[in-house]
Swiss-Prot record:
Residues 963-982 are annotated as: Disordered. Its EC number is 2.7.7.6. Belongs to the RNA polymerase beta chain family. The gene is rpoB. InterPro entries: DNA-dir_RNA_pol_bsu_ext_1_sf, DNA-dir_RNA_pol_su2, DNA-dir_RNAP_su2_dom, DNA-dir_RNAP_su2_hyb_sf, RNA_pol_bsu_bac, RNA_pol_bsu_CS, RNA_pol_bsu_protrusion, RNA_pol_Rpb2_2. DNA-dependent RNA polymerase catalyzes the transcription of DNA into RNA using the four ribonucleoside triphosphates as substrates. This is DNA-directed RNA polymerase subunit beta. Residues 966-975 have a biased composition (Polar residues). It catalyses: RNA(n) + a ribonucleoside 5'-triphosphate = RNA(n+1) + diphosphate.
Length: 1079
């Protein structure tokens, strides 16, 4: 991104470039770096000194072979898309002839063209992690007496922390654990320094001399210093003299020094920069010189010299991308390989055999390490394939969580909050909602990962000597030294720039300075935001929280059966669609020979190239991935031209929703509190119809009585449920199946105790008597569909640990219905509450009925006025047959620029169509509409227009649930909650209040007691409901189980709860006769 020849022009970088660059950096640098450090511990010569054995891997001679299977086949057959890694190795044993050979050390998963890895047929992506950069940081805090304590925190490459602190008595301590601390002189002595060196190099020797005179802080010899350090670190006080000194040194090296003092290359650079040291970058461990320099700087802080560090500044963070994570796993695999080689050599020596290179190296460590990493590591996610937007966004995700990072419960508000150094690098809007807010987010559109894991953002350099504009990428550390002009400078008149006063950023502050003082200016208005936020038109008119919701909900939009481009967009839709990999793009210029449903044939320089199409492929979110040709026979194509559109793309642009006619007005309470009223037209014309592909799977095990059998002969099963099975017992391709139908017929052998007669028959005829039970695969309750694919997956020979699998894929066609969730691009979301006939919907003055009716009260309180601008501009675009692409913050050109644009387009639409109601000067943007039921006009004008509305993946077919029978909680004996556990509907406080308000005391009693946690009564109710009659009344001693639980909890607090029964005679109450009953 440096030195673009096109002056003043900037192109948006590839949105998945970060993943590609990270994986290439791992192949070019990470692999060689880890191989060059093999073995990491003692060499094999030290392991086997008597045998003179050595084993080496040569780092610069590795190579990857071409994968045996294609990416498409790996996904279909549930395999891993990987390549074999070959490395040159050498083996030496005494005076034997040295062996040198290229060996395979395992399979390395490869990144595909989308930036993901395919592991066992599942696409996975490795997200970025933000950690505190290794180095030293100075801060201060108040002790329990209110005095200021200055602290220097040294963070290692592994995340370990060593704190140096100076208290009010000018005593300097090193905190080796949360509870224990030792004198800085003792730590320096344990690291190899003597008192003379310390005093000669100290800036304040008098403080160290005074410190040495104090008994608890005095200098000690190295042996006793190591002993005290070990005692404090391990909290060990007994048998000090009996411990071996060499053992203590080795233990401290492996635990304390390796965890807290290994800085790494980045940590060494940071400490040298902060403390003005000149230590070689190859020395990556903490040295006594570092401790002394850090102490000198800490004392200076005590005397008011120097500045404290901002731990949340982005210059003090580093990004662990896919390159770093894969390199760590490769190093772990090499450690396991080293252990395996040692074991193999040891066994060979015991048997007096000469091992060979072919038997020494095994591929198991590398293969299993990466498989467990992609399956179990918290930063390895299942790739979100809901729509093309998620294909791009997921790889640009970052997280503070994960190994070495923060936790959800302990992260403070200051860490979660927006920092000025984030601008242009981390999106200030797009983050998760809930407990992870601020801990997970997305990179800005132009952000890139630079050297040492820093985030960089591009800027235009403003040169005073020449008019040439050069583009440079600056990290947050370098940016502090320059005046950065904001996006407003883009709109300035080139002739009068010298006279302008513009806003700028300098050292995390916003200033107003003259144009000639600006060093750099922004490249693009969307530079500060993530991709999801960059797709929101009129973003500047929305509240930030609503923009956050919009960004999250766009990733939840399901691809529709017939996609449509938005009328009002931002111009970012094309880049997102192209980089997502969903459309099919030609790599060569040529001529179309023919187009088929499954492939496109292209003639290139006399050769025929076949481009296969993706047809009805299931995504990880059960949405469909499908490509349709956009070219015809005889067309000439250029390189980079789109041959086929995918799901949710039209003409190479992102198309997540539909342009529908909406109005903002209340309608009989059906759009109260974010409910949405829709027209039947959306159902009948399949406007919001989507396809979903569900997967059903069954495993075929090898049991003790033999293998399970797949058959269509299932005893004691209704033949109607078996109607779709073929002769092999598997459902027929193309069958229409309903809930409860058998998809795969399977019989499992059972181990049962036979009667004496059957055992006699077995002995006489020497044939076992088979007893089986049916364990068929049935279609779950989530509905009906069409079987589009059946896969029988074999992975090697079948065994108990490696069963065969049969997968059945079912296509569902879902129309929009009551309970589905819809949303706009401004955080305006709602649930469909009623589907009105077309003739009952409110209609415009030209007779067109509205498609959706939103509640107008949801706009002013939520401050997402951008939807009103989009609605009105969409109406003008629909009438004029125009599409608008509007960049945000257009007020930098003139005041009220958005309003003027919308009104001018409405006025032009009114003139060209001859409809004066489109733009009424008295109430611009509003119109008088009519009630479809009566034909009468409504009293007030209503805002109407065309908005781009999405259908979200939260659909009623996946949510609706009813409980007839199900499990109970063991503690409270109440029904469990949740659809997945067949739970019940929770009746909480507000529901109880509602029933109390209606006065339904008996129904309330039944819900809370008889049908809930009355153990005996709820069993009797079932028979009563079947046979009729009055509900049984519980006995006085039969109390609800939740009440018993409350009593037991009170007893645990030493509170005894009793109640008394008041006896009653025939005539009146006798309050003096009471029977005490313990609960």
């Amino acid at each position: 991104m440096l030195g673009d020849r096109n002056e003043g022009m900037a192109t948006i970088p590839a949105l998945n470039q970060i993943q590609f660059e990270g994986f290439c950096r791992f192949l070019d640098q990470g692999l060689i770096e880890e191989l060059s450090q093999f073995p990491k511990g003692n060499s094999f010569l030290e392991y086997f000194r008597d045998e003179e054995i050595d084993f080496q891997l040569f780092s610069k001679t590795y190579h990857l072979v071409k994968p045996l299977i294609k990416e498409r086949d790996a996904r279909y057959e549930s395999l891993t898309y990987s390549s074999k890694l070959y490395v040159s190795a050498g083996f030496l044993w005494k005076d034997k002839r040295p062996q040198k050979k290229t060996i395979c050390i395992g399979n390395l998963p490869l990144m595909n063209s989308v930036g993901t890895f395919i592991v066992n047929g599942i696409s996975r992506v490795v997200i970025n992690q933000i950690l505190q950069s290794p180095g030293i940081y100075y801060g201060s805090e108040l002790d329990y007496q209110g005095f200021t304590v200055y602290i220097a925190t040294i963070i290692s490459d592994w995340g370990g922390r060593l704190k140096l602190e100076i208290d009010k008595k000018e005593r300097i301590w090193a905190r080796v654990s949360r509870k224990q601390k030792i004198s800085i002189l003792v730590l320096s002595s344990a690291m190899g320094s003597n008192l003379k060196e310390i005093l000669e190099n100290a800036c304040y020797p008098e403080i160290f001399l005074a410190l040495n005179l104090k008994k608890e802080c005095g200098f000690k010899e190295k042996k006793y210093a190591i002993l005290e350090l070990y005692a404090k670190y391990k909290d060990f006080t007994e048998y000090k003299d009996s411990l071996d000194f060499d053992f203590l040194c080795e233990t401290l090296r492996k635990t304390f020094f390796s965890h807290k003092c290994e800085l790494g290359r980045v940590g060494r650079q940071n400490i040298n920069r902060r403390l003005n040291l000149d230590i070689s970058h190859k020395n990556t461990f903490l040295l006594p010189q570092d401790i002394l320099a850090a102490t000198n700087h800490l004392i200076g802080m005590k005397f008011g010299m120097g500045t404290l560090d901002d731990m949340n500044h982005l210059k003090n963070k580093r990004i662990r991308s896919v390159a770093d994570l894969l390199q760590d796993q490769f190093g772990l695999a090499l450690n396991r390989l080293e252990d395996a080689v040692c074991d193999t050599i040891g066994r060979a020596i015991a048997k007096d055999k000469i091992p060979t290179l072919r038997h020494l190296a095994t591929s198991t460590p590398l293969t299993t390490t990466y498989e467990s990493f992609f399956k179990l590591h918290p930063l390895s996610h299942v790739f979100d394939e809901t729509n093309p937007l998620t294909h791009i966004v997921h790889g640009r995700k970052w997280s503070f969580l994960g190994p070495g990072g923060l936790t959800e419960r302990t992260a403070r508000f200051r860490v979660r909050d927006i920092h000025p150094s984030n601008y242009g690098r981390i999106c200030p809007i797009d983050t998760s909602e809930g407990i992870k807010v601020g801990l997970i987010g997305y990179l800005a559109t132009h952000a890139r990962i630079g050297d040492c894991g820093s985030l960089e953002s591009p800027f235009y350099e403003m040169s005073e000597k020449s008019k040439r504009v050069r583009m440079l990428s600056l990290s947050s550390r370098k940016e502090e030294y320059y005046m950065i002009g904001t996006g407003n400078s883009l709109a300035l008149n080139q002739g009068i720039q010298e006279e302008q006063i513009i806003p700028a950023r300098y050292r995390q502050e916003f200033l107003t300075i003259a144009w000639e003082e600006v060093h750099f200016r922004s490249v693009f208005p969307f530079q500060y935001f993530s991709i999801g936020v960059s797709l929101i038109p009129f973003l500047e008119h929305n509240d930030a929280t609503r923009a956050l919701m919009s960004s999250n909900m766009q990733r939840q939009a399901v691809p529709l059966s017939r996609s449509e481009k938005c009328i009002v967009g931002t111009g970012f839709e094309g880049q997102v669609a192209l980089d997502s990999g969903i459309p099919l793009i030609t790599e060569h210029a040529g001529k179309i020979i023919s187009t088929h449903t499954d492939k496109i044939l292209l003639s290139v320089n006399g050769e025929t190239l076949s481009s296969p199409l993706v047809l009805f492929q299931r995504s990880n979110k059960n949405t469909w991935i499908h490509q349709t040709p956009q070219v015809s026979r005889g067309n000439c194509t250029k390189k980079g031209q789109i041959l086929a559109d995918g799901a949710a793309t039209v003409g190479g642009e992102l198309a997540l929703g539909k342009n529908v006619l909406v109005g903002y007005m209340p309608w009989e309470g059906y759009n109260f509190e974010d409910a949405v009223l829709i027209s039947e037209r959306l159902v009948y014309e399949d406007i919001y119809t989507s396809f979903h592909i569900r997967k059903c799977e069954i495993k075929i095990f090898m049991t003790m009585k033999g293998p399970e059998k797949i058959t269509n002969q299932i005893p004691h099963i209704d033949p109607h449920l078996l109607r779709n099975l073929d002769k092999n017992g598997v459902v027929i391709l193309g069958s229409w199946v309903e809930a409860g139908d058998i998809l795969v017929g399977k019989l499992t052998p059972e181990l049962v105790e036979l009667s004496p007669e059957k055992r006699l028959i077995e002995a006489l005829f020497d044939a076992p008597i088979g007893t089986t039970r049916q364990s068929c695969l049935k279609l779950p309750i989530w509905g009906r569909g069409r079987v589009i694919d059946v896969r029988w997956i074999h992975k090697g020979s079948a065994s108990r640990s490696n069963p065969e699998r049969i997968r059945v894929y079912i296509l569902q066609k879902r129309k929009i219905k009551v309970g589905d969730k819809v949303a706009g691009r401004h955080g305006n979301k709602g649930i469909v509450s009623k589907i009105l006939p077309i003739q009952d919907m409110p209609y415009l003055q030209d007779g067109r009925p509205l498609d959706m009716v939103f509640n107008p009260l949801g706009v002013p309180s939520r401050m997402n006025v951008g939807q009103i601008f989009e609605c009105s501009l969409g109406l003008a675009g629909g009438l004029l047959d125009r599409h608008y692409r509007i960049a945000p913050f257009d007020e930098r050109y003139e005041e009220e620029a958005s309003r003027k644009l919308v009104f001018s387009e409405l006025y032009e639409a009114s003139k060209q169509t001859g409809n004066p109601w489109v733009f009424e000067p008295e109430y611009p943007g509003k119109s008088i509409i009519f009630d479809g039921r009566t034909g009468d006009p409504f009293e007030q004008p209503v805002i109407v227009g065309q908005s781009y509305i999405l259908k979200l993946i939260h659909q009623v077919d996946d949510k609706i649930h009813g409980r007839s029978t199900g499990p109970y909680s063991r503690v409270t004996q109440q029904p469990v909650k949740g659809r997945a556990r067949r739970g019940g509907q929770r009746v909480g406080e507000m529901e109880v209040w509602a029933l109390q308000g209606l006065g339904v005391a008996h129904i309330l009693e039944e819900i809370l007691t008889y049908k809930s946690d009355h153990l005996t009564t709820r069993n009797q109710i079932f028979g009563t409901l079947l046979l009729g009659g009055a509900l049984p009344k519980p006995e006085p001693e039969d109390r609800p189980e939740s009440f018993r639980l409350l009593v037991r909890e009170l007893r645990s607090l030493s509170l005894e709860l009793n109640y008394f029964l008041v006896s009653k005679n025939k005539k009146n109450f006798n309050f003096w006769k009471m029977n005490r009953v313990e609960v």
